[in-house]
Amino acid sequence: MLSAVFLAGQLLSRGVAAQSFPLDACKGFQPKNVTVECASYRGRKAVRVTSLPGADAAYNMQQSGTGGGIVLLPRSSFHNGTIDVDVAAMPRVHAPALARGFAGIAFRVPPDATRYDYVYIRPTNGRADDQERRNHSAQYASFPNNEWLKLRKESPGKYESYVDLVPGAWTHLRIEINGVRMRLYVNRASQPTLLVNDLKLGDCSGAVALWIGVGTEAYFAHLQLKPQGK
């Protein structure tokens, strides 16, 4: 399985139309501030990603707009195009009360992973009995200088939106990226849930990674990358 994952990354770098990372094997991944393991969830092989032991105790980091972690996909390379992935996420057992099951994708990650743009969902907000929480169901942010709290304070409502979500249910995410523009489609909807026209890191290239926030248990399956124009 490891060879298949590496082959996908190698072929993608040569410009092959669409490459698949099945996410059914755990070797070769590069986790940062999270744990990753193979799992079976609701009848599907997947990888399970959770925050490191003790990370929830530092939940104030998340509240101040930082925190979370990534799992870099080996030899992935991405500039413009589409990212498709299935994710199922929820707050983990004993997570802080304000945990929402934060999970999504980081893209254009440099080798040192010191900065990246990312987009994610908050599954427990999707059907909350509170309109403001519903409006915060999907989020774009950029690590480390434009995290969610900063963006919300400076541009309320611009980088997050509502989408119907169910905690723990498999949810399909499709992310379209072109230059400094990003579109997020959820569950194969014909119209995007979230539109961003000013990606904070600009028009760059890098790796792709699975992303979760603290207090999260998330499962990822069948990630595909398709370069623009292929």
Describe the function of each predicted region.
Residues 1-5:
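Sec-dependent N-terminal signal peptides
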Residues 7, 13, 17-18:
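Boundary at the C-terminal end of the N-terminal hydrophobic targeting segment
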Residues 17-230:
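Extracellular glycan-recognition regions
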